From Swiss-Prot:
<feature type="DNA-binding region" description="H-T-H motif">
    <location>
        <begin position="21"/>
        <end position="40"/>
    </location>
</feature>
<keyword id="KW-0238">DNA-binding</keyword>
<protein>
    <recommendedName>
        <fullName>Uncharacterized HTH-type transcriptional regulator YvaF</fullName>
    </recommendedName>
</protein>
<dbReference type="Pfam" id="PF00440">
    <property type="entry name" value="TetR_N"/>
</dbReference>
<dbReference type="InterPro" id="IPR036271">
    <property type="entry name" value="Tet_transcr_reg_TetR-rel_C_sf"/>
</dbReference>
<dbReference type="InterPro" id="IPR009057">
    <property type="entry name" value="Homeodomain-like_sf"/>
</dbReference>
<keyword id="KW-0678">Repressor</keyword>
<dbReference type="GO" id="GO:0000976">
    <property type="term" value="F:transcription cis-regulatory region binding"/>
</dbReference>
<dbReference type="InterPro" id="IPR050109">
    <property type="entry name" value="HTH-type_TetR-like_transc_reg"/>
</dbReference>
<dbReference type="InterPro" id="IPR001647">
    <property type="entry name" value="HTH_TetR"/>
</dbReference>
<dbReference type="GO" id="GO:0003700">
    <property type="term" value="F:DNA-binding transcription factor activity"/>
</dbReference>
<dbReference type="GO" id="GO:0006355">
    <property type="term" value="P:regulation of DNA-templated transcription"/>
</dbReference>
<feature type="domain" description="HTH tetR-type">
    <location>
        <begin position="1"/>
        <end position="58"/>
    </location>
</feature>
<keyword id="KW-0804">Transcription</keyword>
<keyword id="KW-0805">Transcription regulation</keyword>
């Protein structure tokens, strides 16, 4: 039942944001609020559990990419920059603001994860520099540029939202950040 509760809560968050009620959740599950409160003493505790499950899923994706021996270090960075944000698609700016406003402790947990999440990417970028797979750039600046780009994608007012899938946009962002905008011949001439 616990997994069903978390899955339905996640669905309701996507549908209604964090304004869903425990009544909404009980009705969607065909159970009573009493049953819900047997598993979670409050909506805050339930939201915290959803955030923790979400973080665990993102860490598993990251671990799978990091441990994939068929990928070189540069491919691992690219995969992380494309795959992880797709998993975080639920977290648009509106939902993050709601989470911060109504479930502050859960927001703190998620915020800490989002900030620390870049440690592995930074380590991989530094490894790429050492292996001369990328130019001598500032990895922190690269990550901030990337975060700024993906924040635009998750903005509800993002103008290209309906023209491209999130995956297509993320792949384009990573392509531009890794390869720039000049054609190979032009890059060779400069």
């Amino acid at each position: 039942m616990d997994k069903r509760i978390l899955a339905e809560t996640f669905r309701l968050i996507k549908q209604k944001g964090f304004s869903f009620t425990m009544n909404d959740l009980a009705a969607a599950l065909g159970t009573s609020k009493r049953t819900l409160y047997a598993y979670y003493s409050s909506k805050d505790q339930l939201v915290e559990a959803v955030v923790e499950q979400f973080i665990a899923e993102m860490k598993q994706i990251e671990r799978d990419i990091y441990e994939n021996e068929s990928l070189n270090v540069l491919e691992k960075v690219k995969q992380m920059l494309i795959s992880l944000p797709q998993g975080m698609e639920l977290l648009n700016m509106g939902l993050l603001n709601e989470l911060k406003k109504y479930h502050y402790d859960a927001w703190l947990t998620l915020d800490a994860f989002i900030k620390e999440e870049w440690a592995i990417v930074l380590a991989l970028l530094n490894e790429c520099k050492q292996q001369k797979r990328i130019r001598n750039i500032n990895p922190d600046l690269f990550v901030h540029m990337y975060i700024g780009s993906i924040n635009q994608v998750y903005d509800p007012e993002y103008p290209l939202k309906h023209q491209f899938t999130t995956g297509e946009v993320l792949e384009s962002i990573v392509d531009v950040l890794f390869n720039g905008i000049t054609a190979d011949e032009e890059a060779d001439a400069t």
